Amino acid sequence: MSWVINPEIVDSKQRARAIARVRELGVVLPTFSQLADPATIPAAVLSRLADVAPDEPRVENLWRVNWYNAADRSGHAEVPGFIVIPESISGVKAPIVVLLGRRFPMIGAHKVLPAYSALAAQLVTGRFDPVTQKAIWPSTGNYCRGGVSISRILGCRGVAVLPAGMSRERFEWLEQWVAHPDDIIRTPGTESNVKEIYDKCAELERDPQNVILNQFSAFSNYLIHYICTGTAAEHAFTAFKGDTNRRLAGFVSATGSAGTIAAGDYLKKRHGTRIAAVEALECPTMLNNGYGEHNIQGIGDKHIPLIHNVMNTDVVIGVSDRVTDQLNLLFGSDAGRNYLRDRRRLDGELVSSFADVGISGFANIVASIKLAKQLHYGPDDVIVTVATDSGSLYDSERDDYRTKHFGGSFDEVNAGEVFGSCLTSIATDNVMELTDQMRRQIFNLGYYTWVEQQGVSVEDFERRRSQSFWDGIADSMPEWDALIEDFNAEASGSNEAASASKARS
């Protein structure tokens, strides 16, 4: 069995049942290119969104699964939402542009994007029957939330599989969205316990009615981030750059499923951008072939995802969860915000904007600072990174950390200490510029997960060493768009549906 899902129909009867279900629900699937460039979405479709709240399980919200939502998450934005981290915070001259995943619909995180691409790819090829089968979403939190929301919109049952130790807010959201309490499956451990998730999925997969949509091995995850997140990062950079001579020097991304980092491949091809992969220092899989527990929720470790283009990665950076937990407290507490405004003289609007940054976003920001220092980037060297979700998902984590490490009271003196130790004093330790030999070592580490444990053939595993393999995935987007258009056309013969499915730039 090949682990790459090609853009071709494999089961016409099952596809026909999927078409009947989306016809019944009045669904028109956005093409991948439309999500990359929402300017190509028909005006009639966009106008209907005005009456739909972004967090409702409505079919219209499929069209909001893109980077171009306004700050209120309802309207359309001409440029993806981003904030710029200035030298007064980072201590480096290189501007750091942070894309904001909070603006995505339903889950307030950009992981709904690969969830959509995964299920859409299954539906249009006839690999999934939304009437009789369940969509199983293995995740450390945000991807399974995205999967459950997309499943609900598309009329099928979604099951979340995630570690029991994830934030309370994740589980509270899931409890409101799943069809049945049994559709939340808690596995042992926390963020880095991905193996336990795989084991549960292997058990569930024995039932043919359960279809595993594994983000760590779904190349639709790579493809959608390559085109959508890559395009959004480029657009945000261009908007920030203006008519200056700045260059897109670096792209920084934590490697949870290694989907987001695919945007780096897009940017490297077009701008020569250096790609930096981020992991928790407490679980230094790439840095040291290490292992351990950590609390940078949103990135899973102790293995190399199948969809990580390791041979195109330039730098690996380790960030401690002590730093990210403390930054979550600094920017998310009244005392911290008061310190930043009053003592550091930071703009109040800038300080408030950090509400849009979650724990993994802080990891990416700190890693960007490390990258800028390591590579001696200057004011014309722009680094782009991503805040997957917002601080609102980590209120409970913030409270727990305050109680455990600050005795329940966090004041402006504490805030000053955190600012100094976690931002201005950030060093270039645990930064590894990769040689070809180092890339091969990291690549080979994936063998033990994917070949020995998950049954990927050696041939399929090895194909991923070549950049031509990844270029082939990226170049398949027009074929996927065509499959989606054909699926839509069969689901509805109306002129409106036809124009919605075929509009593109």
Predicted regions and their residues:
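PLP-dependent amino-acid enzyme catalytic core
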Residues: M1-S505
